[in-house]
Amino acid sequence: MVDRVKRIQCAPALLLLALLAGCGGASAPRSMADLINPLLGPDWSAWLVGPISRLATPEETRAFLALKDDAAAAAFAESFWSKRGNGIRHAYAERAVTADRLYSEGGYLGHRTDRGVIYVLYGPPEKEGFEVSPNPRDSAIEVWSYGKDAPSGLDGNRPNPVYRFIKRGDLTVSYVPRAQPLALPPVDH
């Protein structure tokens, strides 16, 4: 009976250890909250949120999240941009200003919104349009198209041919259509 009680008392600690062990191997943060460094001041704590998170390597992301003060964050940012060159830094700054002007909404700067991230990374789309949403209660789906010959973005990758966005509350977010279920043939009984 005593062994059973000890096992029950240890269960929460073991569960916590298992969860921590499972998270330790994660290569990159999975959400906006994972990109915020709470040890830094307001000018630096969310520096990774937005397109920079797509430019940073997993090692750079981990290093930034381990910083302890704003001076270290400023030095980190300077080193980050010096590795990428002035052309990328300049293009990033110009596109971020434009994204802030065009896509700020819901209390977020434009370059930190889904449309803004794509705009900063790949520039303006070749074509913009709208599609009717499959859900009649939803707004129209905004569609951005990049040509097959679109140049690589600031992240070194070519853009996807199509990006879709839909209004959800105060924000316009990325929209990925659900796959239609396969129609199964009728079964004879």
Task: Enumerate the language-model features and the residues they cover.
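Residues within mature, well-folded domains
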Residues: 24-189
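Bacterial N-terminal signal peptides that target proteins for export
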Residues: 2-13
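C-terminal motif of bacterial Sec signal peptides marking the signal peptidase cleavage site
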Residues: 20-22
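Residue-level signal for mature regions of secreted extracellular proteins and peptides
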Residues: 16-17
